[in-house]
C-alpha cells in the first residue's frame, strides 16, 4: 500500500505505506454545526470521499501528520535523497520519453544547461499529474493513433485511453459569515 491511512483499511486504502492520510482535525464548532445541519436536513453521510462513493457530507481526509502538511515528497522523495544513484534535477522540463522497441529507455530534458537525453537501465516513473502525464505520453508518440497522426507525432504505441476520462472532482464551497463561533481563519491569526 502507498498510503498509511489512519481511518480506513479496505479495498480502497492501506495503512502500511509511507504516505500519511487522516481525517482533518480539529473539528471546529462551525464544522460540527454544518455537519449536524446536513444530518438534520436528511443528507447522506459519507465517511470516506476517497472510497466507493463521493456524494454526501462528511469530513475530508488530508495528508497531515502531527499537525503539518505531509506531501508525496515527504513520503517518497526525502527518505531517499541521499542515495548515490539518485540525482534530483530542479527547474527541468521533460520534453519526451525516449523509446526503443516500445520500451522506455530514457527521457529528453531541457533546463538552463540546454537539452539532453538521460538514459535509464531500469524503469522510468512518470508522475506528471492528470494533465502533464498524458501530454508527455502523447508528445512521446504513445496515445490515440488518430490524434497523434493529426498532430504529426510519430506513433510509438496506439493507446486509445491516453488523455481520456479526465473527470472533475466536483465540490461546492459555501461561505457564510457566522457569529459567536471561532473559524479556522480566526484561529490562525
Can you describe what each PLM-predicted range is?
Residues 1-104, 108-110, 173-189:
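Conserved redox-cofactor binding core of oxidoreductases
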Residues 97-189:
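Glycine-rich loop(s) and the adjacent beta-strand/alpha-helix scaffold that form part
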Amino acid at each position: 500500500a502507498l498510503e498509511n491511512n489512519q481511518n480506513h483499511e479496505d479495498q480502497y486504502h492501506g495503512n502500511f505505506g509511507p504516505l500519511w492520510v487522516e481525517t482533518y482535525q480539529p473539528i471546529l464548532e462551525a464544522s460540527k454545526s454544518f455537519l449536524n445541519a446536513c444530518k438534520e436536513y436528511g443528507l447522506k453521510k459519507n465517511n470516506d470521499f476517497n472510497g466507493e462513493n463521493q456524494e454526501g457530507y462528511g469530513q475530508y481526509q488530508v495528508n497531515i501528520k502531527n499537525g503539518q502538511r505531509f506531501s508525496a515528497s515527504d513520503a517518497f522523495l526525502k527518505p531517499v535523497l541521499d542515495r548515490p544513484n539518485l540525482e534530483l534535477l530542479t527547474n527541468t522540463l521533460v520534453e519526451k520519453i525516449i523509446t526503443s522497441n516500445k520500451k522506455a529507455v530514457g527521457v529528453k530534458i531541457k533546463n538552463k544547461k540546454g537539452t539532453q537525453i538521460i538514459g535509464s537501465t531500469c524503469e522510468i516513473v512518470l508522475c506528471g499529474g492528470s494533465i502533464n502525464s498524458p501530454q508527455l505520453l502523447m508528445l512521446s508518440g504513445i496515445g490515440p493513433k488518430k490524434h497523434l497522426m493529426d498532430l504529426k507525432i510519430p506513433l510509438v504505441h496506439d493507446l486509445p485511453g491516453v488523455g481520456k476520462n479526465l473527470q472533475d472532482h466536483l465540490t461546492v464551497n459555501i461561505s457564510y459569515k457566522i457569529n459567536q463561533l471561532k473559524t479556522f481563519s480566526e484561529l490562525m491569526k
